[in-house]
């Protein structure tokens, strides 16, 4: 085996084209497949961008190079220095004839998982051997689209004058008063893993930042075992001052629309590889009220009372009717957290919204309460002690502007963009009730 020494990759596989006929290149990656046929060997090298064929004819290479090629195993790490030779019969209109092959590392055999995708594996097996699973081109395509999604979102926020922030993930109490928190030992105290940056986002509005966003982990100790829930997730959160819930919804529409447009422009190969039925949405999404959603569900035989949260059956009924991306607005105040602003004309209804894709909720937001007295009243009415929120409430005593915001589930949005039916497909190392490794 060789060290990398003075060799450096000159091209990824997708950068080599027939017009480079006669040019010398250095390629590095994994042995995707190997076929040795007497005096001829075919080596398919795979790197991050795809695959490329190296043809090793015994009469055109030295003895050592041919001997190395014949002994290669699947998933060995290799480097090839060779010449591009145009050939209309080759898969991409060219092949590479090696001048030298270096084996940088050997892979054990048999492989516990087949990255070539010729042998199917259950998702639990794939997640157990995730380092091999993510070598698969289709899996890499999912995460390249996810990466472009995050890049696009950051750019949209930056172009809009937002400040990126980082809030604590070790907290002293529940953000929303719930009990679904992971407790941890924090020296002599009890602490929790943060379930939301919500309170900190609002405190920054009191600090005069005007517009902030954060992309970070959240933790929920919910005992779900579904295809759409995880206990550790990435949340894309924003908060804006001197706006209402309609402005927040407009910003969310812009973020989502730009993601679709940027992915279409920058990741066409991944869209094709995943065979996605890609369609950029309209710049504004359909909107229905909670009451209208209830009516749709009831009309489809799903009984739900006004004031109840939407059940899975109700979400499916509404999703079947609406399709695509749409907002549900005007939620019952009792279904929303204490910091959600009720309507002036009817305090049973609040200025909250959910962004749905078919039956899947991908974002939730609202205009927030910015008056101290109302906030204290809401906390008390929900059976919580305002003293537990002392540092948060203090920010509302000395000049808190009207504000609104939302949180968008990055993992769920990636599910939508890549048309996956299990959220675990879109997370490198998912954490759920059963899985804490790798």
From Swiss-Prot:
Mg(2+) 2 binds at residues 361, 364. One of its GO terms (cellular component) is cytosol. InterPro entries: Aa-tRNA-synt_II (IPR004364), aa-tRNA-synth_II (IPR006195), aa-tRNA-synth_II/BPL/LPL (IPR045864), Asp-tRNA_synthase_2 (IPR004523), Asp/Asn-tRNA-synth_IIb (IPR002312), NA-bd_OB-fold (IPR012340), NA-bd_OB_tRNA (IPR004365). It is an enzyme of class 6 (ligase). ATP binds at residues 220-222, 228-230, 361, 409-412. GO terms for molecular function: aspartate-tRNA ligase activity; aspartate-tRNA(Asn) ligase activity; ATP binding; magnesium ion binding; RNA binding. L-aspartate binds at residues 176, 220, 364, 368. PROSITE patterns: AA_TRNA_LIGASE_II. Mg(2+) 3 binds at residue 361. Its EC number is 6.1.1.23. The record marks 91 as: Important for tRNA non-discrimination. It is found in: Cytoplasm. Its cofactor is Mg(2+). It catalyses: tRNA(Asx) + L-aspartate + ATP = L-aspartyl-tRNA(Asx) + AMP + diphosphate. Residues 198-201 are annotated as: Aspartate. Keywords: Aminoacyl-tRNA synthetase, ATP-binding, Cytoplasm, Ligase, Magnesium, Metal-binding, Nucleotide-binding, Protein biosynthesis. Binds 3 Mg(2+) cations per subunit. The strongest magnesium site (Mg1) is bound to the beta- and gamma-phosphates of ATP and four water molecules complete its coordination sphere. GO terms for biological process: aspartyl-tRNA aminoacylation. HAMAP family: Asp_tRNA_synth_type2. Belongs to the class-II aminoacyl-tRNA synthetase family. Type 2 subfamily. Aspartyl-tRNA synthetase with relaxed tRNA specificity since it is able to aspartylate not only its cognate tRNA(Asp) but also tRNA(Asn). Reaction proceeds in two steps: L-aspartate is first activated by ATP to form Asp-AMP and then transferred to the acceptor end of tRNA(Asp/Asn). This is Aspartate--tRNA(Asp/Asn) ligase. It comes from Methanococcus maripaludis (strain C5 / ATCC BAA-1333). The gene is aspS.
